[in-house]
Amino acid sequence: MGYIRWFLSFLKKYRVRMIVGLILVFITALLVLINPQISGMIVDEVIEGQHYEKLGILLLIMIGVTLVRSLLRFTFLMCFESSSQGLVYDMREEAYRKLMKEDFNFFNKNRTGDLMSRQTGDMDAVRHMVSHVIYFSFENILVFLMALVMIFSVNVKMALCMLIVLPFTLAVTLSQRRHIKPAFDRVRDCFSSLNAFAQETIAGNRVVKAFAKEDYELEKFDRENDGYRDAQLNAASIWMKYIPMFEILSQCLTIILMIMGGFMVIDGEMTIGNMVTVNGYLWMLNSPLRQAGWIINDLQRFLTAIEKIYKVYTTEPDIKQPEHVVEKRKLKGSVTFEHVNYYTNDDTVLKDISFHVEPGQTVGIIGATGSGKSSLINLICRFYDVNQGRVLVDDIDVRNLNLQTLRGNIGIAMQDVFLFSDTIEGNIAYGNPDCTFEQVQAAAKIANADEFIREMPEGYDTIIGERGVGLSGGQKQRISLARAILKDPSIIILDDTTSAIDMETESMIQNELKKISDERTVFIIAHRISSIIHADQILVLDNGRLVERGTHEQLLAKKGYYSTVFHHQYGEFDRFKKVRAEKGRGEA
């Protein structure tokens, strides 16, 4: 029940407001008891006793009590509603802050739609609990107990007979609670799955349309939607079958009153006014019984939701800030791998990797798909931790560096470019929000993006869609590169950043990068040798191993993997030029 304690820790901030609200609920419940008494007095004293002068006063009291109750109800509803909004705001902020601290492994294991449902649907169930269920449950319990006490004060025998219903009510309540929770657990799971599927399909709509798979995705959505509908219907059928039981129990009280009350009035044990009074209190007993099923239903929704939110909140990241942080605001940029082994589950990704890079050097990384290039870069940024060996930046183990310091000194243009739904300027300035427009433009020029940006309708103020919709692959890569450059980092990482750019544009970008790379360490992951031919050292990875290392000339001399790739790529290029030249002579 740790999730309940966690929930109460948020509720504590609003305890004064909640206590005031509960006190007002208590006063309102007391006022509810007055009108049945007045109804009985009207029957006994006004109608039967013929004291007609009392009728006006009694009616004014009833009206006054009703007005005061309405005012108090409005006040305590505002107390609970404001508390619920504040609590959910705090909880959502804390949950989102927790999400921002999670590592890559967490997001690899959890789908975006699942996490979104925690922040929306589950949070709304918590809000409903605080704004409605708490006061409603408290009010119903108070009204039930007070009405029972008042019936005892009117006629003990009648009250004892009505108590016969309580054990049956308790049994039905416990039975409903036992059966409804698994049903609501399934509802929340199905909702998360549906939400995740919809989010994934919408995000990948271009692929869906490119492969004409709309009908296929619609069928999959129908299955998810059917599952959610069936889960909802199953939960509804469980709690709805208990509603008639509570109705029957409440009607039993009415039957007891009619039978016993009638005999007591005939025998002179009760007056008609007493019976009218008891009938008024009977409504107060019946109403909580009728509402019990709904309250349990809402309570189980809340418990299911808060448990799922709590699971996300209590998930500890694998990558944590070190206990004894080495503080160093500006890094020089040297990088060292010492016998690094890295694996995920049972799959070895990197095996015994060792190399050293001096500050200001440019390092090219090449290898077949799946050889471990991106994983190697991820270890420098400490997106993951090594299983054996060490990764050092400025001769400090990255596990001892402050994460913000480490990543703040690294500018990375990722292979999978992500751009926010913002202006182009906002996207480029993401890593350095305090920069000037001139700095943004300078970074764009280095990335060879300034020209196409200025040609856009609003220039740098052009709003680009989510994930850069509306831009070509090469344009997105250049904006991503400009974003990494503008951060002014000690280490720049380009993860296949120019794969969607033509060779002429790539050459222009490389020339611009050379002007700033003397004071920065640059890692370039590439499949095209032209992207790394100028590097101070080139790392060749094959199946997770560092099989070759050296300059372009040194690696060609080894006649190994690098040499093979080079001659293959440039051989194809030479053949292409030869065919084109022959075609040109033929046309002449």
Residue ranges and their predicted role:
Residues 328-588:
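ABC-type nucleotide-binding domain
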Residues 85, 105, 113, 117, ...:
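Short active-site loops of ABC-family nucleotide-binding domains
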Residues 1-35, 47-59, 63, 76-84, ...:
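Membrane-integrated ABC transporters
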Residues 316-330:
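Pre-NBD coupling/linker segments of ABC/ABC-like ATPases
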Residues 104-105, 121-130, 134, 138, ...:
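An intracellular "coupling" helix at the cytosolic face of ABC transporter transmembrane type-1 domains
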Residues 13, 17-30, 61-71, 132-186, ...:
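Transmembrane helices of ABC transporter permease
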